[in-house]
Amino acid sequence: MATKLIVGLGNPGPKYLWTRHNAGFMVLDRLAHAIGASVTRKSFSGVFGEGAWHGERLLLLKPQTYMNLSGRSVAEALRFHKLPLCDTIVIHDDLDIPFGRVKVKEGGGHGGHNGLRSLVQELGGAGFVRVRVGIGRPVHGDVVNYVLTNFSQDEMADLAHLLDGTLDLLESLLTAGLPKTMSLYNNKDLLAP
């Protein structure tokens, strides 16, 4: 059974629970629930759990270091489990993708995302798979404030569809591979009827 480390990026604590920056945590929680795993064990400067899905052993990690230091947590987990970077899937929010869409890719720059910046720095490279959950850009105002505010009421009404669609993407990634998943999901509106 192959092993994958799946990381959801976010900020710890109830204050950040429903913020846009916590989209990675939300998807990871949805995945854990779907596979009957519990992500509660304190380990690797985060909370950790394990489960299996489609013949893969999944190590689930939510760094508790705050976004800007997420790389430390992920590096600890990879070292302990002796996993290569290519067996890591990182789920994070993305300002450059509209709400309701997700994209998946391997490698690339951090695009100004401090969590990704920390990962690339601590891991010594960017050769991990990224599941980019669209949160859109603010019409007015500061990006930092925007990512740390809760989803709007309209977005909250559609959030379950976005999370379920992202879970479908993860399932495709594990069963069909990256190229097929990219072609299926990278331009798909998950909120379309």
From Swiss-Prot:
Q: CDD domains given for it?
A: PTH
User: Where is it mainly found?
Assistant: cytoplasm
Chain sites annotated for binding tRNA: 16, 66, 68, 114
Catalytic center residues: 21
UniProt entry keywords in alphabetical sequence: Cytoplasm, Hydrolase, RNA-binding, tRNA-binding
Molecular functions per Gene Ontology: peptidyl-tRNA hydrolase activity; tRNA binding
What is the superkingdom listed in this entry's lineage?
Answer: Bacteria
Task: Give the signal sequence positions.
Answer: none
User: Site annotated as Stabilizes the basic form of H active site to accept a proton: where?
Assistant: 93
- Specify one Pfam family: Pept_tRNA_hydro
Q: Which reaction does it catalyse?
A: an N-acyl-L-alpha-aminoacyl-tRNA + H2O = an N-acyl-L-amino acid + a tRNA + H(+)
PROSITE patterns from the UniProt entry: PEPT_TRNA_HYDROL_1 (PS01195), PEPT_TRNA_HYDROL_2 (PS01196)
**One GO term describing the cellular component:** cytoplasm
Assembly description: Monomer.
The protein here is known as Peptidyl-tRNA hydrolase
- Biological source species: Geobacter sulfurreducens (strain ATCC 51573 / DSM 12127 / PCA)
**Source organism phylogeny:** Bacteria, Pseudomonadati, Thermodesulfobacteriota, Desulfuromonadia, Geobacterales
Q: Which gene encodes it?
A: pth
